[in-house]
Amino acid sequence: MTRHPSRPTPQTIPRSDAAARGLEEPAIETVLFDTHKWVGFVAVVANGIAGIVCLVAWRVVRWRGRWVWILTIVAEVLFLFDVVVGTALVAAYKFKPPGIHMFYGFLVFITVGLAFQYRESMRGRTELLYGLVGLFLMGLGIRAVFQVV
């Protein structure tokens, strides 16, 4: 019967040795890029849903309520967050997006700002305004995705 040599006691790997042994955590730019990609997809879908819900709420009074505005705000904030993450990728990590991808992000910020500015002048038709804005943002997002894919 042969004896197996005893295993060495496990030791914690110092941070500096982690990369040498292949145990490196993903780089922050990889995490930001994946976040930008997936939040972008979610924001496109969320703005499409929010746009349709707002248009239905404009026509059907029963549908109006706080939940419509919460959905709309969450959808728009997702897009704004996605634009900020994309801006961080370009500014800090020198990512070069193709075509006019960055222009679509700029348009998202402008559109959300203009919609917020015009909400007072659209009293009684605010759901219509935000429904059209949600669908427009969805279209911008789809165009931005097709610039990359």
Task: Give each language-model segment a name.
Residues 40-45, 95-107:
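Structural signature of hydrophobic alpha-helical transmembrane segments
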Residues 91-95, 113-128, 145-149:
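Membrane-helix boundary connector in multi-pass membrane proteins
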Residues 43-60:
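N-terminal signal-anchor/start-transfer transmembrane helix
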